[in-house]
Amino acid sequence: MSLKLHNTLGNKKEEFIPIHEGKAGVYGCGPTVYDYAHIGNLRTYVFQDILVKTLRFLGYDVTHVMNITDVGHLTDDEDSGEDKMVKSAEERGKSVLEIAEFYTKAFFNDTERLNIERPGIVCKATEHINEMIELIKRIEANGHTYMAGGNLYYDISTFPKYGELANINLEDLKAGARIEIDKNKRNPHDFVLWFTKSKFENQALVWDSPWGRGYPGWHIECSAMSMKYLGEQIDIHKGGIDHIRVHHTNEIAQSEGATGKKWVNYWLHNEFLVMNKGKMSKSAGSFIILEDVINKGFSALDYRFLLLGGHYRSQLTFSWEAMETAKNGRKNLNNRVAKWLDGLSDSEIMEYAALTENLNLKSAKDMIKNEKARSCFDNFIAAMEDDLSTPKALSELQLLIKEKDIPQKDVLTVLAAMDSILGIKLIEESFNTLKDKGSIEIDESEILKLIEERASAKLDKNYKLADEIRDKLKGMGIILEDQAGKTTWKKL
């Protein structure tokens, strides 16, 4: 099987075929750092992390780029409202740069606790103004812009494909326009590439440009920075569904308006995290941050586990009851995994934990010898290759740890491979469970059943299976002694 992803552009599942064989260029919209990320925002970054981990595990050389918006994002995506950074700075009595630095650190503190791998390239908008200006010049040279009221606008009527991503056309946009009117715009859905002081007198960060001293519109930064680090055509662009209608639609128009080439091959979007009152929203004041979750007695990994239980393209309802279920589910999972660790030395356990960082599809297949273990592993990979189906993948994980006749080393190798993608620190957290309990309680009936199965295997001269059962019991902390045709057991 091969990796298939649901492409928003075309609204169908497609086989992933990279531009350059064996490589994957991935761009994701990062946070606007004017406040803490709420847990709905963080769902996007867990999804992006799962995507990147899956690509890497499948053997792709991934270049992962994410922006940090620290200038130019208004409270409404359609160029209206206040500047989010300026508003936050004024409310808190800080400078815009102080606000950006504080909330950028807070964001990465949250992602670290969620075991989200930091993208290889993190780029700030304020550090790429020259790239934005140069890209705007190309867009202007191709006849897609006009000046009005001191600002440079993108004229969407010059780009016939406008709205294709969101499956809307220009006539629908005109008929359904319900946004704040900007009298400078020829079309309500035209958007600003470069603001001057005509928009905000109090803008804290401004730069010289061919169109006057000012600052960039929000959309241009993603086009400019993705092209700098990934080239003019990229494999995958990811983000939340709230970006489809405006931000990502505008990114396509300006990128392809500059280059004349298709910009992104695969668009991936995750659904909202919702509460009983609707979607989580900072502007509406209805949001929860990760610190709130932790202060309620949950861990960040409990929240990650909750997210894995839902497909990224399905809405997921958040509640404290759901968090309690996720917490108990992860606890039970760790207890079961800990049973497979019992009997190993600390160094042996840490070797398996280290495998999580080092395995890929090929190396894992080479290491997994047992047929049942291989089957669980293959089914897990099939689930992830089917548009990142984490609910199905978790089901395969649960089936694996319930098996009783797979050698310990194969189970732990498969667990390490699975966790290379899931990122819930299975072996490390289960090791902590083992240390906290001193030893895992052993089900005596299970031991006796395995001893009987081993005896039957020996009678059938299936010595390989008999040895595997002995090894499994040893992994559970049980030593067998064969004397005078009778087998006894004791704890290590």
Swiss-Prot record:
InterPro entries: Cys-tRNA-ligase (IPR015803), Cys-tRNA-synt_Ia_DALR (IPR015273), Cys-tRNA/MSH_ligase (IPR024909), Rossmann-like_a/b/a_fold (IPR014729), tRNA-synt_1_cat_dom (IPR032678), tRNAsynth_Ia_anticodon-bd (IPR009080). It comes from Treponema denticola (strain ATCC 35405 / DSM 14222 / CIP 103919 / JCM 8153 / KCTC 15104). ATP binds at residue 282. Binds 1 zinc ion per subunit. Its main location: cytoplasm. GO terms for biological process: cysteinyl-tRNA aminoacylation. CDD domains: CysRS_core (cd00672). It catalyses: tRNA(Cys) + L-cysteine + ATP = L-cysteinyl-tRNA(Cys) + AMP + diphosphate. Pfam families: tRNA-synt_1e. Belongs to the class-I aminoacyl-tRNA synthetase family. Its EC number is 6.1.1.16. A motif ('HIGH' region) lies at residues 31-41. A motif ('KMSKS' region) lies at residues 279-283. Coiled coil: none annotated. PANTHER family: CYSTEINE--TRNA LIGASE, CYTOPLASMIC, CYSTEINYL-TRNA SYNTHETASE. This is Cysteine--tRNA ligase. Zn(2+) binds at residues 29, 222, 247, 251. Keywords: Aminoacyl-tRNA synthetase, ATP-binding, Cytoplasm, Ligase, Metal-binding, Nucleotide-binding, Protein biosynthesis, Zinc. Its cofactor is Zn(2+). It comes from the Bacteria. GO terms for cellular component: cytosol.
